[in-house]
């Protein structure tokens, strides 16, 4: 069980005792529920049509800092220190190199805090520790630094279409910066959002319809009627309730640690081991579903997260959603799983690492992901194994998938087999992420004779490398897309995807372009 101590408030200790959950977890859930109510109040009484952006920034920031103080006590000062020093770097260093200095400092400061928490305070504990919010703030600092660098230093023709859309053309004020990093909607569990999307929301420009004018510049034509987020919020709260119920009732009866139990290893058959591995890791996911979906609901309740309308005219509130549960559980490829899990972190990795490095971007991206997650050895085992599995899965797909496209019965057979293989491979890969320590992780892999590691290496050694046209034409396509968008003056404000079109196909293309580079 997680630690029962906390650096934050002990006001809810009686409730913690009553529900038999650690006080830090109770503080987190109660503060998120408070944030949900505050979000409804924020949207109702501090709507952009009723008050100024300044007031909205101030209230969002103060509420966020209060929640941080309640949950983490004086450790919440780390949020201000990390944010404050990073802002000074942005001002002093200048736009040419600020993104590099901010990246090194923010990630370094996060790592130091993670080391002290893990090796000094509570090694191996799953608690709502103060480094959790710092992980989100680190994402925001580094993302914003890159966006400012793109908008104020690099030439437009050097940018990809997504970089141009997100580029920040002026230095944020200190209040805007702190509001972006520490607002109450995302201070505890995120998710990450782009600076432009956040400022657009605060300033009430989320529902503006824009169209290219004759002079090639965007002209606001009219303001769309603001849709209600109530249905989306209720649906997400239902998912939260089911996820929490599943976690509290099922997860404890199917511990991942049982995979390395000596008696289980000695007596269980291989089919039993495989089935239990899958079920135990399946049972470990609902706590993430709960936390991320609740965070998404909070932002939606405040009016943030609207992406546009689908083909049926229904409002889409998934601009900053962090996962798609159905796609995760039905994934038929490693890529499909990763595309739908921790989506905003995947976008961050793509934007600050994958798109900006020329040498082994896949490997460097996995390494950055491991460093960002923390200093437990299990994280590094998971992400190094993930590199191998990703490359092997890509090779298998490129060499064999085209044989199973037709007829439909063969395609169905292929989907069933790849679903089974994907779920087992994902479970096998992430066991160290849950076990954390090196010894139990290696014990697990040894009990499986490192079979998937060996199989992955053999796949890479034996299967021919089939180069796809996608990577070959990436630069060419980017330039064509940039030229077209620059000539038409599309999306110069870098707002949400719905700002330029209601066409669902175009929206899906934008989503695909944001995810595909990291996962392929």
Curated annotation (Swiss-Prot):
Its EC number is 2.3.1.-, 2.3.1.51, 2.3.1.23, 2.3.1.n7. GO terms for cellular component: endoplasmic reticulum membrane; membrane. Signal peptide: none annotated. Partially inhibited by thimerosal. Coiled coil: none annotated. It comes from the Eukaryota. Its main location: endoplasmic reticulum. The chain crosses the membrane at residues 22-42, 61-81, 88-108, 184-204, 237-257, 264-284, 366-386, 416-436, 444-464. It is found in: Endoplasmic reticulum membrane. The active site is at 342, 373. This is Membrane-bound glycerophospholipid O-acyltransferase 2.
């Amino acid at each position: 069980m997680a630690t029962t101590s906390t650096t934050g408030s002990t006001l809810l200790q009686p409730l913690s005792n009553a529900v038999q959950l650690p006080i830090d977890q109770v503080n987190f859930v109660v503060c998120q529920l408070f944030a949900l109510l505050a979000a409804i109040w924020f949207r109702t009484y501090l709507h952009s049509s009723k008050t100024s952006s300044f007031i909205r920034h101030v209230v969002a920031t103060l509420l966020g800092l209060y929640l941080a103080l309640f949950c983490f006590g004086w450790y919440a000062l780390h949020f201000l220190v990390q944010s404050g020093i990073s802002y000074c770097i942005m001002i002093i260093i200048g736009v040419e190199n600020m993104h590099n200095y901010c990246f090194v400092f923010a990630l370094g400061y996060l790592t130091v805090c993670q080391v002290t928490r893990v090796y000094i305070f509570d090694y191996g504990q799953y608690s709502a520790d103060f480094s959790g919010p710092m992980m989100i703030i680190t994402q925001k600092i580094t993302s914003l630094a890159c966006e400012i660098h793109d908008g104020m230093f690099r030439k437009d023709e050097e940018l990809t279409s997504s970089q141009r859309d997100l580029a920040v053309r002026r230095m944020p004020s200190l209040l805007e910066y702190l509001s972006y990093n520490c607002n109450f909607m995302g201070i505890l569990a995120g998710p990450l959002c782009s600076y432009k999307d956040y400022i657009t929301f605060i300033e009430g420009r989320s529902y503006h319809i824009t169209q290219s004018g004759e002079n090639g510049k965007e002209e606001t034509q009219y303001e769309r009627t603001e849709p209600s987020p109530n249905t989306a919020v209720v649906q997400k709260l239902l998912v939260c309730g089911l996820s929490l119920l599943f976690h509290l009732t099922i997860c404890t009866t199917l511990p991942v640690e049982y995979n390395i139990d000596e008696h289980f290893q000695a007596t269980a058959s291989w089919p039993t081991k495989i089935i239990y591995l899958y079920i135990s890791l399946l049972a470990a996911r609902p706590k993430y579903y709960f936390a991320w979906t609740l965070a998404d609901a909070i932002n939606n309740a405040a009016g943030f997260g609207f992406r546009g309308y689908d083909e049926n005219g229904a409002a889409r509130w998934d601009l900053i959603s962090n996962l798609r549960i159905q796609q995760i559980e039905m994934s038929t490829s490693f890529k499909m799983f990763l595309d739908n899990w921790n989506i905003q972190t995947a976008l961050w990795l793509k934007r600050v690492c994958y798109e900006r490095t020329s040498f082994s971007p896949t490997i460097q991206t996995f390494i950055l992901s491991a460093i960002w997650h923390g200093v437990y050895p299990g994280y590094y085992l998971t992400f190094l194994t993930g590199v191998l599995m990703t490359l092997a899965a890509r090779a298998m797909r490129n060499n064999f998938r085209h044989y199973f496209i037709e007829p439909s019965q063969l395609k169905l057979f292929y989907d069933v087999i790849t679903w089974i293989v994907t779920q087992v491979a994902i479970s096998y890969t992430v066991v160290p992420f849950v076990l954390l320590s090196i010894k139990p992780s290696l014990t697990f892999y040894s009990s499986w004779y490192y079979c998937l590691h060996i199989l992955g290496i053999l796949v890479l050694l034996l299967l021919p490398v089939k180069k796809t046209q996608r990577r070959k034409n990436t630069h060419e396509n980017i330039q064509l897309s940039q030229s077209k968008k620059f000539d038409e003056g599309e999306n110069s404000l870098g707002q949400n995807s719905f700002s330029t079109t209601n066409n669902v196909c175009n929206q899906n293309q934008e989503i695909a372009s944001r995810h595909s580079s990291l996962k392929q």
